[in-house]
UniProtKB/Swiss-Prot annotation:
Membrane topology of the entry: Multi-pass membrane protein
One Pfam family cited in the UniProt record for this chain: BPD_transp_2
Biological role stated in the UniProt entry: Part of the ABC transporter complex RbsABC involved in ribose import. Probably responsible for the translocation of the substrate across the membrane.
Family affiliation: Belongs to the binding-protein-dependent transport system permease family. AraH/RbsC subfamily.
Transmembrane segments: 22-42, 48-70, 77-94, 101-121, 126-146, 169-189, 219-239, 294-314
Entry protein name: Ribose import permease protein RbsC
Superkingdom assignment: Bacteria
Length: 322
């Protein structure tokens, strides 16, 4: 009897593991079929390219959020970091700074802002939710102070900067290429390096990781810095695409990123998840947004639908963790 129970439990664990890996792919496949049936224009090449451009920004933010959530943390400030770094990049370009240098400096600033989050959480012993909620408010305020609440325009006609957010390379949107390159680098970092193994170890059992010699504080600060850097990179892409910096940019982007991570199978309790799943989650959110737009659904109802999807994803995560 005990042997049968053990075999049944092993089968259940195996099934749960398979569903964790294949579930996001299956969800995306079903969603694409439904949207395609309701509006065949969804699969037109022009719309697919537009979809890839749209998901790039959320993709970059969600990749950083994946590392954060894998440690059992959360970062509510990513949208505010995007807005502040976007404004600073635009301001530098208007002041005559070379766009490439401005983007690099913007990413460094984003990493520093993320580092502040990491230090508040590790050295300040603050809960990630509270710490990043506070910095989100501060960064939003600094953005409004810097821009005086007005968009920053007059970014010039630099070809390279325009290409960064709106251009194509071999027929593929440059933002999508940027997202894919970031994905490859981060996949290697997470799955093929000691840093990635330490990230999983901290999320699985932080006390055990500390006892085993992992420098938890350093790893966490680096992870939040990485999340800030990727948010700033996303902000630079948005600035290029809009050819301006909006003081309200990035609002609710943190929710889309968290939704993508959870839909991709990463556990909110940490220690379990894959960046491949996050990429699929990003495509699910993007397909949902794009499909609802094609169907002419009001933006108000879109928020309701997105909220329901996030709720379902969290409930499924809790069920798996139980």
């Amino acid at each position: 009897m005990k042997t049968e129970q053990l075999q049944t439990e092993q089968k259940r664990i195996h099934f749960d593991g398979v569903m964790q890996k294949l579930g996001p792919f299956l969800g995306l496949f079903i969603l694409v079929i439904i949207v395609s049936i309701l509006n065949p224009s969804f699969l037109e090449p022009l719309n697919i390219l537009n979809l890839l451009r749209q998901v790039a920004i959320n993709g970059l933010i969600a990749f950083g959020m994946t590392f954060v959530i894998l440690t059992g943390g959360i970062d509510l400030s990513v949208g505010a970091i995007l807005a502040l770094s976007s404004a600073l990049v635009a301001g530098m370009i208007v002041s005559g700074v070379d766009p490439v240098l401005a983007i690099i400096l913007g990413c460094i600033i984003g990493a520093v802002l993320g580092m502040i989050n990491g230090l508040l959480i590790t050295k300040g012993k603050m809960a990630p939710f509270i710490a990043t909620l506070a910095t989100m408010t501060v960064f939003r305020g600094l953005t409004l102070v810097y821009t005086d609440g007005n968009p920053i325009t007059g970014l010039g006609t630099n070809y390279g900067f325009q290409m960064f957010g709106r251009g194509y390379f071999l027929g593929i949107p440059v933002p999508a290429i940027t997202m894919v390159l970031a994905f490859v680098i981060l996949w290697v970092l997470l799955h093929k390096t000691p840093f990635g193994r330490r990230t999983y170890a901290i999320g699985g059992n932080e006390k055990a990781a500390l006892i085993s010699g992992i420098k938890v504080t350093r790893v966490k600060v680096m992870i939040y810095s990485l999340a800030g850097l990727l948010s700033a990179l996303a902000g630079a892409i948005l600035t290029s695409r809009l050819h301006s910096a909006q003081p309200t940019a990035g609002e609710s982007y943190e929710l889309d990123a968290i939704a993508a991570v959870v839909l991709g199978g990463t556990s909110l309790s940490g220690g379990r998840g894959r960046i491949v799943g996050t990429l699929i989650g990003v495509l699910i959110i993007g397909t949902l947004n794009n499909g609802l737009n094609l169907l002419g659904v009001s933006s108000f109802y879109q928020l309701v639908v997105k909220g329901i999807v996030i709720l379902i994803a969290v409930l499924l995560d809790r069920k798996k963790s139980a």
